[in-house]
From Swiss-Prot:
Gene responsible for this protein: mdh
EC number of the protein: 1.1.1.37
Gene Ontology MF terms: L-malate dehydrogenase (NAD+) activity
Protein name, entry field: Malate dehydrogenase
Catalytic activity field: (S)-malate + NAD(+) = oxaloacetate + NADH + H(+)
Organism annotation: Paraburkholderia phytofirmans (strain DSM 17436 / LMG 22146 / PsJN)
Length: 327
């Protein structure tokens, strides 16, 4: 017997990331090949025509798992009974815009969306914030939804995680799928810290295989941190397909489990690893039965502490910049 359809809300539905994301969700890549979905698409009033065009294309794919589509500019319609909410839409930084202005503009969007989720979404809704600054936007949404469990709110660090995996595979000559126990700590920004001190490839210790501290500090970490900028430089557009792919990975693993493998998610801190409570911070997790669990008890050396504190300080500054908007 067919499963009842799950409702997946996607914001910024007319945008580039959503265009790479929606067809994969409708194809079963997000929640499984036996799980029907209803897409609930949110975008601004002026983008409704473009969303309709995307929905025409979705119709033309005749996806067996796509049970229905809702198009709206009202967050309360988009998030009604949502099982998963992918918050992709955010205010991009325009020329001459200060970072604090960007934070304020996004605080407004994510306060409204957090309140709407609080009011109408499923109490078990899994929220992934993709729109930047993702960690702080997730924090704002979480703080605006006091009736939902904090653990329901996450930010996307999976793109950084996947970027790091690919660099490590290239450097070590090992298949990307063989690399395990990679962690990415902190903010989804150039300050985040990809950490392969615990990683293995085909069961071998990756730090011994690579054995190049200079490469780690001066090539690997900056390459992962600045990859988004490098793609804009090369392509003239920001990374959309790889971001959509990371969003699929993040939610699929959260829902269907990681079989004991580590992945990175931005989650509300419980105070461990010296990260103040409630800060949305990238940490290694495993997922099972629809829940994530942080990997506990990892040793933090002096270099790692410095890196982890650097990215934390950026998050604390961002939080400071939006605190007055949260009431």
């Amino acid at each position: 017997m067919a499963k009842p359809a799950k409702r997946v809300a996607v914001t910024g539905a007319a945008g580039q990331i959503a265009y790479s994301l929606l067809f994969r969700i409708a194809n079963g890549d997000l929640l499984g090949k036996d799980q029907p979905v209803i897409l609930q698409l949110l975008d601004l009033p002026q983008a409704q025509g473009a969303v309709k065009g995307v929905v025409m294309e979705l119709d033309d794919c005749a996806f067996p798992l796509l049970s229905g589509v809702v198009i709206t500019d009202d967050p309360e319609v988009a998030f009604k009974d949502a099982d998963v909410a992918l918050l992709v839409g955010a205010r991009p930084r325009s020329k001459g815009m200060e970072r604090k202005d960007l934070l304020s503009a996004n605080a407004e969007i994510f306060t409204v969306q957090g309140k709407a989720l609080n009011k109408v979404a499923s109490r078990d809704v899994k929220v992934l914030v993709v729109g930047n600054p993702a960690n702080t936007n997730a924090y704002i949404a979480m703080k605006s939804a006091p009736d939902l469990p904090k653990k329901n709110f996450t930010a996307m660090l999976r793109l950084d995680h996947n970027r790091a995996l690919s660099q490590l595979a290239a450097k070590s000559g090992k298949p990307v799928a063989s690399i395990e126990k990679l962690a990415v700590w902190g903010n989804h920004s150039p300050t985040m810290y990809p950490d392969f001190r615990f990683a293995t490839a085909e069961g071998q210790d990756l730090t011994k295989l690579i054995n190049d501290d200079e490469w780690n500090r001066n090539t690997f970490i900056p390459t992962v941190g600045k990859r988004g900028a490098a793609i804009i430089e090369a392509r003239g557009l920001s990374s959309a397909a790889s971001a959509a792919n990371a969003a699929i990975d993040h939610v699929r693993d959260w829902v269907l489990g990681t079989n004991g493998k580590w992945v990175t998610m931005g989650i509300p801190s419980d105070g461990s690893y010296g990260i103040p409570e409630d800060i949305i911070y990238g940490v290694p997790v495993t997922c099972e039965n629809g829940e994530y669990k942080r990997v506990e008890g990892l040793e933090i050396d002096a270099f790692s502490r410095e890196k982890m504190d650097g990215t934390l300080n950026e998050l604390l500054e961002e939080r400071e910049g939006v605190q007055h908007l949260l009431g």
